[in-house]
Amino acid sequence: MQFKWATGTNNQVYQDALSIRRKVFIEEQHVDETIEIDGTDNTKHHVVGYLDNIPQATARINPLDQDTLKIQRVAVHQTQRGLGLGRQLMNEIENWARTNNFKRLILSAQDPVIPFYERANYLISNPEGYFEAGIPHHDMEKVLH
């Protein structure tokens, strides 16, 4: 899988990321579009994974401070799940974080995919959990070494 990065919304990478997010979150999971497209994409980094130049996986990256990176909107196209693309995407993000001297990654995981993140050594940081867009979530984190 080939990865492309961009910042903001005036680029093809963002448009490709948005197409995956619309399919996964709005169409599949029925997340309200005003929640998914929250008006903050223009200040975030976006990464998209391509297979044969077709966008298949994406995430939104939000540096919170000099040490902490928040990973958001992680999505893999429905037809490509279970093939390791999500793992490749997370590896790409972790490599980018290390290159840019981030020490800690945090994310809000939908409960059904917590095992995916646990396999990548993320730990639940709030045992009580919460609902976001009607979907149960838990915060998770990983310290980079």
Task: Annotate each PLM feature.
Residues 1-41, 46, 50-54:
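Short amphipathic alpha-helix that is part of the acyltransferase structural core
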Residues 63-72, 81, 131-137:
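A conserved beta-turn-beta hairpin within the catalytic core of GNAT-like acetyltransferases
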Residues 76, 82-95:
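Conserved acetyl-CoA-binding loop-helix of GNAT-fold acetyltransferases
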Residues 90, 95-110:
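Conserved GNAT acetyl-CoA-binding A-motif
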Residues 108, 123-139:
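Conserved catalytic-core motifs of GNAT/GCN5-like acyltransferases
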